[in-house]
Swiss-Prot record:
GO terms for cellular component: extracellular region; host cell. Its main location: secreted. The keyword Secreted applies. It comes from the Eukaryota. This is RxLR effector protein 62. Secreted effector that suppresses callose deposition, a hallmark of pathogen-associated molecular pattern (PAMP)-triggered immunity (PTI) and renders host plants more susceptible to bacterial infection. Reduces host plant responsiveness to salicylic acid (SA) in haustoriated cells into which host-translocated effectors are delivered. Induction: Highly expressed during infection. Residues 1-19 form the signal peptide. Glycans are attached at N61. It is found in: Secreted; Host cell. It comes from Hyaloperonospora arabidopsidis (strain Emoy2).
Amino acid sequence: MRLDILLFTLSSSTSLALSYSLPMDPAHSSVHTLSAADRHIGERVTRQRHLREEPANEARNYSDLAVEIKRLVEELDSRVLEQADISLLDRHYAGDYKAFRSDLMTYGYQTRFAEQYKLFKKLGIDFKHNY
């Protein structure tokens, strides 16, 4: 009986777990053995590892998503520009680079402006640089 009380006190003070969880019975004291695993510390270590690894994984996922979104936007832009009637754009702006740039900025195409301008230059559409 004293051994059981000693084991119980030891397990509660050092957070060691008893492998047998039924009420202590002096007739079955040999069944009560200490488990070497410290559950409390193990849970804390696991939680700390999870907190360290999670932000790195999320940052990696966000950077992968940013690359994928950029690729999809560029692909969509190229499809739209391939289908657009470039000559209509040229006649509408009549080579006025400032109006073209202003319209692009107004409608939120700032990130696409450089690529579209390069495409217009490649297609031979020249804008006056009067900005």
